[in-house]
């Protein structure tokens, strides 16, 4: 649990001024603020400086104006919510990338929050600050379709997790869906081998992929290497970033990532690494289009 000064510091990080009693309205405010202010990212992985996913380490990332990916983001968010008096449940989950089958791989830390309704019954909500292409607000853990801005989500029973559920993402999203196991996890120990693979293995999809994402009320942003994608109700606009100054400006202004843990020299090295891979990617695309 966080101390009161830590709670206040965390809330300041995401732009919330006052502590409130647990409620659906406050939960939604916290969720919107978190996914807007704290990006999902692979920065430390690409830089070769992965951060442990222990809950204390994940909270420190937030308090130091840094970020991470699902294990860090949902881990820290779950601690904040519990410290504010919410009933939070952690779950083993698996993200289904495009072109692959649904799976319960344990490569995602899922969260639900229980709130007591006027009849005294607990109503569960899916909350997720760690999907990258995440929902903007909590989603009721009930079968149905839910629209948030230009994105549409569907909740249904999982076919790979007995007694679990599935969140189907919008057709234009970066992944197809995510399946959740119903069992509650008291700690995140079982995720540590997955984190070790994702953060250090050459086979990891994030090993050399600089990727930063966040949400806002009208859509989402993504910076994949040097390609900035802006998605809203009108579609997706892609912008190629061709200078370090513009790249750092987009990181700071759009994603609120100022690379505070990196020196000027390290930021230069990171940019050159990302730019080099971007040029290699463009060359590969050109060769594929002109065999």
Show where each model-derived region lies.
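N-terminal accessory/pre-domain segments preceding catalytic cores
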Residues: 1-24, 83-84, 160-291
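Short N-terminal helix-initiation segments at or just after the protein's N-terminus
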Residues: 49-60, 151-159, 173
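Hydrophobic/aromatic-rich core segments of domains that either
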Residues: 75, 79-155
């Amino acid at each position: 649990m966080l101390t009161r000064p830590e709670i206040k510091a965390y809330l300041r990080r995401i732009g919330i001024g006052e502590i409130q009693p647990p409620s659906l309205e406050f939960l939604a405010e916290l969720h919107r603020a978190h996914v807007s202010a704290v990006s999902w990212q692979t920065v430390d992985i690409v830089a070769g400086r992965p951060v442990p996913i222990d809950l204390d380490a994940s909270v420190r990332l937030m308090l130091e104006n840094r970020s991470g990916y699902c294990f860090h983001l949902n881990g820290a968010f779950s601690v904040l919510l519990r410290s504010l008096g919410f009933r939070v449940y952690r779950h083993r989950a698996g993200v289904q990338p495009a072109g692959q089958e649904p799976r319960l791989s344990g490569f995602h830390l899922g969260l639900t929050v229980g709130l007591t309704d006027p009849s005294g019954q607990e109503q569960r909500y899916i909350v997720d600050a760690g999907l990258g292409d995440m929902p903007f607000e909590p989603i009721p853990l009930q079968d149905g379709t839910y629209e948030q801005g230009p994105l549409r989500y569907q909740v249904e029973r999982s076919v790979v997790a007995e007694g679990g559920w599935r969140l189907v993402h919008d057709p234009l999203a970066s992944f197809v869906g995510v399946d959740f196991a119903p069992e509650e996890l008291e700690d995140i120990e079982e995720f540590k081998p997955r984190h070790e693979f994702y953060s250090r293995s050459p086979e990891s999809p994030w090993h050399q992929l600089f990727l930063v994402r966040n949400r806002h009320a009208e859509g989402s942003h993504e910076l994949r290497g040097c390609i900035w994608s802006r998605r809203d109700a009108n579609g997706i606009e892609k912008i190629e970033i061709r200078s370090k100054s513009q790249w750092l400006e987009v990181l700071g202004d759009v994603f609120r990532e100022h690379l505070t843990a990196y020196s000027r020299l390290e930021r230069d090295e990171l940019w050159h690494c990302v730019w080099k891979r971007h040029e290699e990617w463009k060359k590969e695309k050109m060769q594929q289009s002109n065999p």
